[in-house]
């Protein structure tokens, strides 16, 4: 079996694969100060408590946007699984042609998403929208050129900024809304977050389409923890919640 670990700004998202099929996924809050022992014990326990044998994990792939976590995570893999993990980073085979001015700046999670999307939909122009701590947009051509994208504050970051930088605005649950007009403070914040983000998705998707694909409509794929909030809005042609993990698996296979 193969264990894929996507290290985000707030969570580690783990997926356990049996060949090409994901049989288990789970999450852990990511802390830059977490020891390799804490992480290794958590991973083994989570796998075992879900009915799988940690000893059957033969390969591990790591994709991280938090560089300081990689060292301790590598140590956890070595100590608790006896595996030197594959790190998705600059210099590995991806199958993509990175058109960023500085390819080293592209986040590993954005590369993983792009690898998976081009594998799932070969020969198509793509816009990938990943709604996590940050909301990222990536444009990938049908020739597997990674063209670039946009990055905006994610829904939770926006909500936390309102709470921490104002005197009276509370923390709220982030939910899909049905009306733009709020009639109480909490509703108003929720509406602003939801429809503000929806507008961002629509506007950036439209502008990227014009700039990258000369108005020819690309396939738009949503992923990340908040992607399902916008399912009813029809802004995505497809929602693939585990896109990043699938991309890591494919990258691992390319570099075997």
From Swiss-Prot:
<dbReference type="InterPro" id="IPR043129">
    <property type="entry name" value="ATPase_NBD"/>
</dbReference>
<dbReference type="Pfam" id="PF03309">
    <property type="entry name" value="Pan_kinase"/>
</dbReference>
<dbReference type="GO" id="GO:0005524">
    <property type="term" value="F:ATP binding"/>
</dbReference>
<dbReference type="GO" id="GO:0005737">
    <property type="term" value="C:cytoplasm"/>
</dbReference>
<feature type="binding site">
    <location>
        <begin position="107"/>
        <end position="110"/>
    </location>
    <ligand>
        <name>substrate</name>
    </ligand>
</feature>
<dbReference type="InterPro" id="IPR004619">
    <property type="entry name" value="Type_III_PanK"/>
</dbReference>
<feature type="binding site">
    <location>
        <begin position="6"/>
        <end position="13"/>
    </location>
    <ligand>
        <name>ATP</name>
    </ligand>
</feature>
<keyword id="KW-0630">Potassium</keyword>
<keyword id="KW-0418">Kinase</keyword>
<dbReference type="GO" id="GO:0015937">
    <property type="term" value="P:coenzyme A biosynthetic process"/>
</dbReference>
<comment type="function">
    <text>Catalyzes the phosphorylation of pantothenate (Pan), the first step in CoA biosynthesis.</text>
</comment>
<dbReference type="GO" id="GO:0046872">
    <property type="term" value="F:metal ion binding"/>
</dbReference>
<feature type="binding site">
    <location>
        <position position="130"/>
    </location>
    <ligand>
        <name>K(+)</name>
    </ligand>
</feature>
<dbReference type="GO" id="GO:0004594">
    <property type="term" value="F:pantothenate kinase activity"/>
</dbReference>
<keyword id="KW-0173">Coenzyme A biosynthesis</keyword>
<comment type="similarity">
    <text>Belongs to the type III pantothenate kinase family.</text>
</comment>
<feature type="binding site">
    <location>
        <position position="100"/>
    </location>
    <ligand>
        <name>substrate</name>
    </ligand>
</feature>
<keyword id="KW-0963">Cytoplasm</keyword>
<comment type="subunit">
    <text>Homodimer.</text>
</comment>
<feature type="binding site">
    <location>
        <position position="185"/>
    </location>
    <ligand>
        <name>substrate</name>
    </ligand>
</feature>
<keyword id="KW-0479">Metal-binding</keyword>
<keyword id="KW-0067">ATP-binding</keyword>
<comment type="pathway">
    <text>Cofactor biosynthesis; coenzyme A biosynthesis; CoA from (R)-pantothenate: step 1/5.</text>
</comment>
<feature type="active site" description="Proton acceptor">
    <location>
        <position position="109"/>
    </location>
</feature>
<keyword id="KW-0547">Nucleotide-binding</keyword>
<keyword id="KW-0808">Transferase</keyword>
<feature type="binding site">
    <location>
        <position position="133"/>
    </location>
    <ligand>
        <name>ATP</name>
    </ligand>
</feature>
<protein>
    <recommendedName>
        <fullName>Type III pantothenate kinase</fullName>
        <ecNumber>2.7.1.33</ecNumber>
    </recommendedName>
</protein>
């Amino acid at each position: 079996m193969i264990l894929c670990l996507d290290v985000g700004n707030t969570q580690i998202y783990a997926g356990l694969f049996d060949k090409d099929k994901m049989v288990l996924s789970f999450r852990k809050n990511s802390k830059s100060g977490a020891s390799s022992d804490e992480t290794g014990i958590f991973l083994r326990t989570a796998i075992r408590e879900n009915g799988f044998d940690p000893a059957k994990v033969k390969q591990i792939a790591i994709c991280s946007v938090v560089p300081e976590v990689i060292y301790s995570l590598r140590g956890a893999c070595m100590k608790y699984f006896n595996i030197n993990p594959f790190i998705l980073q600059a210099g590995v085979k991806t199958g993509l042609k990175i058109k960023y001015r500085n390819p080293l700046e592209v986040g590993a999670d954005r590369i993983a998403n792009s690898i998976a999307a081009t594998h799932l939909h070969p020969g198509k122009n793509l816009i990938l929208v990943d709604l996590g701590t940050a909301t990222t947009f990536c444009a990938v051509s049908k020739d597997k050129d990674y063209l670039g994208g946009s990055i905006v504050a994610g829904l939770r970051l926006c909500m936390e900024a309102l709470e921490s930088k104002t005197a009276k605005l509370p923390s709220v649950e982030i939910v899909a809304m049905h009306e733009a007009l709020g009639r109480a403070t909490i509703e108003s914040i929720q509406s602003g977050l939801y429809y503000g983000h929806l507008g961002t998705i629509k506007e950036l998707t439209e502008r990227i389409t014009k700039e990258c694909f000369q108005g020819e409509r690309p396939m738009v794929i949503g992923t990340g923890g908040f992607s399902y909030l916008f399912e009813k809005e029809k802004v995505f042609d497809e929602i693939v919640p585990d896109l990043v993990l699938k991309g890591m698996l494919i990258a691992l296979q390319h570099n075997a």
